Amino acid sequence: MMSSLVRHLARVASIAGLATALTLVAASVAIAQKGGNIRGTVTNAQTHAPILGARVAIANPERVAITDDHGTYVLRELPAGTYVVMTSAIGRKPDSSSVSVSAGSTVTRDVVMKEGSLLLSSVIVSATRSPVEASKVASTVNVLTPEQVRQSPARESQDLLREISAVELPRTSSLVGGTAQIVSIRGVDEGRTAVLFDGIPVNDAWGEWIDWGRIPKVMLDRVEVVEGGTSSLYGNGAMGGAISFFSRPLSPGAMTMTLDGGSRDARHGAISAGVPIYGALSANVVGDYQQGGGYNLIDPAKAGAVDVVSQVIQRNAYLRLNYAPSANWSAFVTGHEFGDSRNTGTPLSFANRDQQNFDLGLNYGAYTTGFLSLRAFDGRQTEAQRSTAIRAGGRAAEDSSLTATIPSHDWGGSAQWTRSNTWMLESFSVGGDFRHYQGDFNEVDFNTTCPGVNCGKLARTVSSGGSQNLSGAFIQAIAAPIAPLRIELSARVDRWDNNNGHSLDVTPTATSNVTNTKSYGDSSKTAFSPRVGLRYQLFSSLSLHAAYYRAFRAPNLAELYRKQVSSTSITIPNPYLAAENAEGREAGFDWQPIDWIQFKGTWYVADYNNFNVPTNLTATSTPPRPADCGTVTTCRTRLNVNKSRSEGGEAYVAVHPIQQLFLSGSVNYDDDRQQSGLPAGTTDNTKPHINRVPSPKQTLRGTYSSAMFGDWTALYRHEGHTTTLQGVWLDPFTVVDANVQREIVPGVRGFVSVENIGDKKYQINLSAAGPAGIASIGMPRTVRVGVEAYRY
């Protein structure tokens, strides 16, 4: 196996050639740059020992440094000016101070950090859309710090989220299965959580699906998760909360290169470099490539000749140009190319995605005098897929049932102005954004009566699509009228317009084609999303927080306009769908009775209304069956008819008994049940659960770090009972993952990651209940071995 691994790593290394050359150029050119530097050491106030893994950052231009084993850091190539330097570390109180830098100089800024929060030690931006200590916000927030991201056994950005118990993901890894990937928070159901990468939406334009592969782990600085409805700041889709990924800012001259491989022919290579160009102009270059590591999804007890290994190839190429002439303003332009090619478990089935994203931004000013942030983005995606029907009799053969192409395009922008300590407020923000979506679903259906004379013949073609414009504006005021009390008030108004709905389906007959063309009317809707949050510091060790919010989600293009036709059924578009909405309440506490242990917990309840779901139409239904349904037996459309309630709680604990050891754990219980369409006599205990919401969930994480032995991390995950999308119950499961990494020589570390150490066999899907059901299984034991070279 070792010789095979070396061979694969050598093959993957070829993708790094150009970026390596750029890195060498960066190292040589950096010497001639005229910018200033900030360097220093971060130490423990009690023991005076250096702190490893502290995050030292400035906001404009964006720079981040992580302290090494000696607690040292360097922020390189800064334009002359005054900066607010923020330092954070787990178990330490965040530090913020101003530092002035002149051209060509190096300023020393040593930081002595006092003991602080174990669970809320970071400075975050997603909870209020401006920097604030996590321990001050009136929300339930969870942060994966740069060190936690680096030490995680997870291979994918999606899998990083699995250790946050309130985040619900499909059991299927994003490395296998289809491209339509989703996420949920607190049982709000799929597709109703905002996901952002550097402040720009990741949810795609057609179905709000997420390509986790376009956020490779090697690019990440940190992850912030805000739980509960956040539409008052983020607008559409943030019914369950917001997940924000932040890329690692690369200083000119910085670089990382990673090569790894492992189980089932897995190969991965990545490189990133900060390249000085001229004066205040620099570039960030990132390349990431991976393939292999897949497996046969079908339980071997039921697998047949048609079942093969599900595989994926993912490619990322990223370029960012940065211009930072002063400490008061900076600008950037980015281009990002992403490709995902996969088979989905049989020889004929596949799903491919290609994306091109272009972003630009401008930051001006400072939070103390007024900080303006402008963003614009443009994204294009083309997806191609083929689905198959498995013939009866032992899964021995398959036939193409559908091929589809799904082109989509979205573009938009945002503006935000924030000022701190003004008008008797701690912070005041106003902003707005706009996003345009357009897309089509073009499918070709084939006859699957096989074997037979019509097997494989064209059954019909269906093309449907439309466009949507969505805009909103928000305002936020944060006040601390008395020292222990902090009040967060925010509100937002959104409007969306559904336009250009259309469909065309063509069914061939023996003599001609039957064509049905339809145009759909335009519609407009609005939503109002307020939020009130309170945090009260009852004692120095105990704080309480509570919040009330309303949130919404506009229907996406797939829900509005996708038309589906078969010989026995039809699903017709509904361009007049209303918004889904949520009304939620939560209350929680943060308690740190002694310096080395902390607890936090939250109770929440949220009512979700107007969920749109496919609904059968009949002559007596409301609305009644229209003429568009034709003569088929079953006619459906999406209607806003479902209601649900999510009620539950979560608890977190962190223990930091010695500097080298950090332990944390969490548990989430979510009772999420349907509230509408129930038969008479249904009680609270017999109301059906919302599908694909596991409960309970538990995680335990332990990390031991030392200069001699390196970093050792173990992660325990348990998911309780859940259901498939079709409502079939899945058994609970438990897995343990681990990661070990150690510096080999200065600037080079080796690592070994193992997912599912016990090779636990667990269900990720089940076609039907009982013995006839065919189970898909989760990822078996997966070992990866690699090396990373770095210069921060």
Residue ranges and their predicted role:
Residues 552, 609, 614, 741-792:
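C-terminal beta-signal and adjacent terminal beta-strands/loops
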Residues 183, 200-227:
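Short acidic/polar hinge/loop motifs at secondary-structure boundaries
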Residues 158, 162-201, 221:
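Extracytoplasmic beta-strand/coil segments of soluble accessory domains associated
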Residues 28-123, 163, 168, 186:
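Periplasm-facing N-terminal accessory domains of Gram-negative outer-membrane beta-barrel systems
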Residues 339, 380-384, 438-440, 445, ...:
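Surface-exposed extracellular loop regions of Gram-negative outer-membrane beta-barrel proteins
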Residues 263-291, 301-341, 350-371, 422-426, ...:
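Transmembrane beta-barrel wall of Gram-negative outer-membrane proteins
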Residues 480-487, 495, 599-608, 628-724:
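Gram-negative outer-membrane beta-barrel transporters
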Residues 310, 318, 408-417, 462, ...:
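Outer membrane beta-barrel strand-and-loop segments of large Gram-negative receptors
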